[in-house]
A protein has these predicted regions:
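Sec-dependent N-terminal signal peptides
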Residues: 2-25
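Solvent-exposed alpha-helical segments and adjacent loops
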Residues: 25-795
Length: 795
């Protein structure tokens, strides 16, 4: 069939358009059409600013979860700086269920100060309820309270995994940003009930926020320090390479370790920090810290003039101005330590590209258990001192989110058979409609504690004085009372408050419709509320490697590590020094304070005689290899293990704290030789000081140290470290308890006696009988003496 010539000329421009095929990325439909589905042809990229929704085809054997959108399918891929963060990376590790009442979810993300976002996009994955009305139901996407787009829910998408691409306005992106999703759902056209169970949308944690932009070259000005080496807006793990000219001396290693603890104290528990070490070689990318003394500068700064004292200098690489070097220089090793101390304590005075340190002087010593990251245990603590961000104690809405507070406590806090922890709780709330059904629930570590009715008060304020129940090892109490699970001391505890309001939202009767505006319900916990851990003793059974992995105990008992000695190998290589920096940096993460008082030694005979806790890196000293407490020995490729009766980490932790002083004798001894990465963490008592501990990070080769680095900087793997020995392999971590318990801390004599006899009822009964007989004998003697005095009075 031939076409008229005029019509041919009209159709000719259409032939130049790209032909859509199966590999083309789905993009936005025209506003008048429903969202593009997988079996529909894709439109042109010109409409990329509109959302694209893709529903799974039921005829295809697709998985139940949507496939992630490929990074190369978005328009910002050409920018030199790229970042893709899933909702799980932004703190929402589980899917979020939006409902008719709780219909909004907020995701927060930050951008480094030396990055400029030029393009942004949201790859949204969600599953809508199959009962929703299409078109009327939709999702609104806000960026920093500005509406970005609306994602309609079509009939073909109901009950199926859906992917939608939403363009975000990069001009609105700053240092701190909030991405908010709001669900507008309808299941019928008349007489809706907002709390109906069919109103829901499941937002997947695999949804991704993509950013593209360019790095910004910062000026060489130390007034911005610790930028660009550490930026609190960067949620990624801190990785800060350290460069030495050659094998550093012991004092240079200490200076680098103190610096690592300072950066670790800022990194925080969830971010963690690593410090790769190299000799006279810069890393291929990123910033770095360079240590040097006169006459021994690394080759990258070989032309630098000699310094006349402790100096901290910020400079750029000539070949790449965006990369910065932090030079820590001095005339000798003592100058390096002074410079690092000034970096940690006095960087508020820094300005310019070069800072010369005149003096650093400590004025007051630290006290035990005063780590900034730990709660005070010498007085009641106000909730205001526990806040992580403003407005943390305030919620609003008909079904508000829970209020949470994080409590980080010393692991040796002794709460055995205590009545509870005093909690003075003050709260305010909007008077509910139904007082009989509105309540405030209190939980800790996801374990229910108590609840209080929310009634109509004149002052709209409540005051409750309760005690958080705790249990020790006496879980088998026979008094018939309800046993509430124990507050787990030593790791991160979370106190949660749930305001549950009972409100009348309207009528769902089809013959009697009522329109009711949702009430603006608000609630708040007063910042003057207190929790009191004072009066508790400090006493713990060791070895307990979970206390080391989760709290840095016993080293972090003194926040500045002034009672810690680290034993390092003589002539340590780069992997061993990197392990030192990562370990001490990890202790800074736990305590939140730099290790000003840290001591290093490469002489075991000298270190073991010091009244301090020992952290041993590398191979164990010869004098410890024959110790009865040693349950694992690594000798190059040969390893010897004493197997105990406790194979699981959970039981190992319970056994380490159960209060039994009896030995857990090994069952068998196994020795093998293998050529593969293998490392271990071993805990034991100091041979010369019974109140001191030794923790050994045992490794023989560079690949073994990589296992230790990975375990100590991974939050999930830290949780598996427990007992007296933890074995690290490429397959994971195996922990067990073998050997004897020893105890550090102090208790009153009567409590000490009662605690250690609690697991031995027969011995306790015999002791009680002896005490009764002795008391009866003394009473008999006293009465006999009184009677003799009465019958034979003296003149």
């Amino acid at each position: 069939m031939s076409l008229p010539t005029s019509l041919r000329w009209l159709l000719l421009p259409l032939l130049a358009l790209p032909i859509a095929n199966g590999s083309s990325a789905p993009v936005a439909p025209a506003p008048a059409r429903p969202a593009t589905t997988a079996d529909q042809p894709a439109s042109t990229p010109a409409a990329a600013s509109l959302p694209v929704a893709v529903a799974s085809d039921p005829a295809l054997p697709a998985s139940t979860t949507p496939s992630p959108v490929q990074p190369q399918s978005w328009r910002g891929q050409a920018w030199p700086w790229q970042r893709a963060s899933s909702f799980a990376d932004l703190g929402r590790r589980q899917d979020v269920m939006l409902s008719g009442v709780r219909n909004a979810a907020t995701y927060e993300f930050q951008v480094r100060r030396d990055r400029l976002a030029r393009d942004a996009e949201l790859d949204l994955s969600f599953t809508p309820s199959p009962a929703l009305l299409p078109t009327l139901s939709h999702l609104r996407v806000f960026l920093n309270d500005a509406l970005m787009d609306v994602v309609p829910i079509s009939d073909s998408q109901l009950g199926k995994p859906v992917q939608a691409k939403v363009a975000l306005d990069a001009r609105l992106i700053g240092d701190f940003n909030q991405l908010r999703l709001e669900f507008v759902g309808h299941y019928t056209d008349i007489c809706e009930e907002p709390t109906h169970s069919s109103l829901w949308v499941n937002v997947a944690s695999s949804s991704v926020v993509r950013l593209g932009g360019q790095p910004l070259a910062m000026q060489d000005d130390l007034a911005n320090f610790p930028l660009p080496f550490f930026d609190p807006r960067d949620s990624a793990r801190l990785e800060l390479p350290v460069v030495f000219a050659s094998t550093p001396s012991l004092q240079q290693q200490r200076a680098a370790a103190v610096m690592a603890s300072y950066f670790g104290s800022m990194a925080g528990w969830w971010r963690q920090a690593r410090f790769p070490v190299s000799f006279d070689t810069l890393p291929e990318k990123g910033h770095a810290v360079v240590f040097g003394v006169n006459g021994k500068f690394p080759s990258i700064i070989a032309g630098h003039a000699a310094v006349q004292g402790p100096v901290i200098e910020l400079t750029s690489l000539p070949s790449d101005p965006e990369r910065k070097l932090l030079l820590v220089l001095g005339r000798n090793d003592a100058d390096l330590q002074t410079a690092v101390a000034a970096m940690a304590a006095g960087n508020a005075l820094f300005r310019g590209s070069v800072v010369k340190v005149d003096e650093v002087k400590s004025l007051a010593p630290r006290k035990p258990y005063d780590a900034p990251n730990w709660m005070r245990t010498d007085r009641a603590v106000r909730f205001a001192d526990l806040l992580d961000y403003p407005q943390q104690l305030r919620v609003q809405g008909v079904s508000p989110q829970p209020i949470t507070l994080n409590l980080n406590l010393p692991p040796d806090l002794f709460i055995w058979r205590n009545q509870g922890i005093p909690l003075n709780l003050r709260y305010r709330y909007t008077p509910p409609f139904n007082s009989d059904e509105s309540r405030l629930g209190v939980s800790i570590n996801d374990q229910f504690i108590s609840s209080f009715p929310l009634i109509k008060r004149t002052g709209k304020q409540g005051l409750e004085e309760i005690r958080l129940p705790v249990m020790g090892s006496d879980a088998g109490s026979g008094d018939g009372s309800l046993l509430i699970p124990a507050l787990k001391i030593g790791n991160r505890n979370q106190l949660r408050f749930d305001f549950n309001f009972a409100s009348v939202m309207g009528s769902a009767q089809r013959d009697h419709c009522q329109t009711t505006l949702p009430p603006n319900l608000q609630a708040a916990i007063e910042e003057d509320s207190t929790i009191d851990f004072s009066g508790f003793h400090h006493y713990i059974g060791l070895p307990d490697l979970s206390a080391f992995a989760l709290s840095g105990f016993p080293f972090t008992r003194m926040a500045d590590l002034s009672e810690t000695v680290v034993l390092v190998p003589p002539q340590a290589n780069a992997a061993q020094i990197g392990m030192l920096l990562n370990a001490v940096g990890g202790l800074g993460v736990q305590s939140g304070y730099p290790a000003y008082g840290l001591r290093l030694s490469d002489d075991w005979k000298q270190a073991v005689n010091l009244d301090a806790d020992l952290l041993v890196l590398g191979t164990l000293p010869e004098s410890l290899r024959g110790s009865d407490q040693l349950s694992l020995l690594i000798d190059n490729q040969r390893s010897t293990l004493l197997n105990g009766r406790v194979p699981s980490p959970q039981t190992a932790v319970a056994d380490a704290r159960q209060g039994s002083s009896a030995a857990d004798a090994p069952i068998n001894r196994v020795a093998v030789t293998a050529d593969a990465p293998f490392a271990a963490i071993i805990g034991m008592q100091s041979p010369n000081h019974p109140q001191r501990s030794i923790v050994s990070l045992a490794a023989a080769q560079s690949s073994d140290y990589a296992l230790l680095d990975d375990a100590l900087t991974d939050i999930g793997k830290r949780a598996a470290i427990a007992g007296s020995v933890s074995i690290l392999r490429t397959s994971g971590i195996h922990s067990q308890f073998v050997g004897e318990h020893y105890y550090v801390g102090s208790l009153p004599w009567w409590l000490l006696l009662w605690y250690h006899l609690a697991d031995h009822p027969a011995l306790l009964a015999v002791l009680a009988m002896v005490v009764v007989l002795l008391a009866a004998f003394l009473l008999w003697r006293l009465l006999r003496w009184v009677s003799l005095r009465r019958l034979n009075p003296e003149p």
